[in-house]
């Protein structure tokens, strides 16, 4: 980006570098520093494209000077190429949501559709947002360079959000045949660990790493032997990854001792309550509701309110949960969100309002684009249909 000043050209150069890597590395082996190899090839491609497009001699000299400056930039603050690029992309001249969306799309490999779902907007709206951001960068000539160590904290909030949304997209894939995208989960965990090594005294950095560890500890328990989705209540907790839980509990304890917790520390604290319960029916739902109350004050969002309503349904009963969920039905961001319909379905089922529960499960199945989730929701509909069938004696069950 520093060389081309154009996101589309930069993306073309990166794709060309990866294509050359596939051809070269298969014959000559992977170089000692793959990231530097790719950067060099992409940079050469950018300079070559500039020459082919008849860039003026003076501009070309500036281009080459920029490339030389890139070579001389200090890298000690952020040693990992991926993390360095994310910090670079999160430029404070752009709105935080735009920084995050660009990083997810351009650096993390998410499709525009996946980025849109992460932000609860339509794909067309996200595509337009990304296009406007690229134009702003080009017109305003926003300088993209690796930030110095002193600048890291001005960008850390956006970087944390990038890593968090990368994890959530991987943890439950918004589209596709698999419940999770393990490569995205592992990439986000690597990035969270590197952030913690870089800023070990930052409570929110610590909280994010704890959140990922505690949530990912359930990875192997979320799908049954036949590939079916297993809800939290149905999981075998003895199969949860104990080392990840132990590490996460230590980290969240450390984060909470640092003073007023931020959103990632609070989400990690909620995950810690789940991880500490030996069985589903021993979950401290009142504590979870209290933590969600703090989270809403710190980071208000419809999704947080939805999760609080679910917790409330177990702390105070399905009636209370359903009332809270119905209050969210007018939220525009949740109009196509399958988990709102699924949460309503579960409350209605517990209230034995079978027909309404069936309709809500059907709505959730229609909205989700994850086939594992859809199969689970359709199985719930089949169970309800069986329960609602008229018995031989003519009485309704």
Regions found by a protein language model. Name each.
Residues 115-117:
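Short alpha-helical "recognition helix" segments of helix-turn-helix
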Residues 1-14, 24-33, 123-124, 174-179:
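Short, charged helix-capping/linker segments at alpha-helix termini
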Residues 53, 57-112, 121-293:
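Amphipathic helix-loop-helix modules that constitute alpha-helical solenoid scaffolds
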Residues 216, 279-282, 315-316, 351, ...:
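Structural motif corresponding to the intra-repeat A-B loop/turn of tetratricopeptide repeats
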């Amino acid at each position: 980006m520093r060389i081309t000043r154009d996101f589309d050209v930069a993306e073309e150069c990166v794709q060309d570098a990866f294509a050359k890597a596939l051809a070269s590395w298969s014959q000559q082996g992977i170089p000692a520093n793959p990231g530097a190899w790719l950067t060099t090839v992409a940079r050469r491609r950018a300079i070559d494209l500039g020459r082919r497009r008849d860039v003026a001699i003076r501009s070309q000299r500036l281009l080459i000077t920029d490339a030389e400056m890139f070579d001389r930039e200090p890298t000690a603050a952020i040693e990992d190429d991926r993390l360095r690029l994310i910090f670079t992309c999160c430029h404070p001249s752009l709105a935080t949501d735009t920084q995050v969306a660009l990083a997810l799309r351009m650096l993390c490999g998410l499709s525009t559709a996946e980025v849109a779902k992460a932000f609860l907007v339509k794909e067309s709206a996200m595509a337009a947002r990304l296009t406007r951001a690229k134009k702003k960068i080009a017109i305003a000539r926003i300088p993209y360079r690796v930030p110095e160590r002193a600048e890291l904290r001005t960008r850390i909030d956006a970087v944390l959000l990038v890593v968090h949304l990368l994890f959530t997209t991987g943890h439950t894939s918004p589209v596709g045949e698999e419940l999770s995208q393990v490569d995205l989960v592992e990439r986000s965990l690597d990035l969270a660990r590197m952030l913690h090594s870089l800023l070990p005294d930052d409570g929110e950095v610590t909280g994010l790493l704890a959140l990922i560890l505690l949530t990912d500890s359930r990875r192997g328990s979320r799908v049954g032997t036949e590939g079916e989705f297993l809800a939290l209540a149905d999981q075998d907790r003895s199969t949860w990854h104990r080392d990840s839980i132990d590490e996460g509990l230590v980290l969240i304890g450390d984060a909470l001792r640092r003073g007023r917790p931020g959103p990632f520390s609070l989400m990690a604290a909620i995950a810690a309550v789940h991880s500490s319960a030996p069985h589903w029916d021993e979950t401290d739902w009142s504590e979870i509701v209290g933590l969600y109350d703090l989270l809403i004050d710190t980071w208000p969002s419809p999704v947080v309110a939805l999760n609080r309503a679910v917790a409330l349904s177990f702390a105070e009963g399905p009636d209370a949960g359903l009332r809270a969920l119905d209050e969210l039905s007018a939220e525009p961001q949740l109009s196509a969100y399958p988990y709102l319909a699924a949460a309503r379905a579960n409350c209605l089922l517990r209230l034995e309002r079978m027909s309404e529960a069936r309709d809500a499960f059907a709505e959730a199945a229609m909205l989700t684009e994850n086939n594992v989730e859809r199969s689970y929701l359709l199985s719930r509909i089949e169970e309800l249909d069986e329960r609602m069938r008229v018995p031989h004696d003519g009485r309704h069950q």
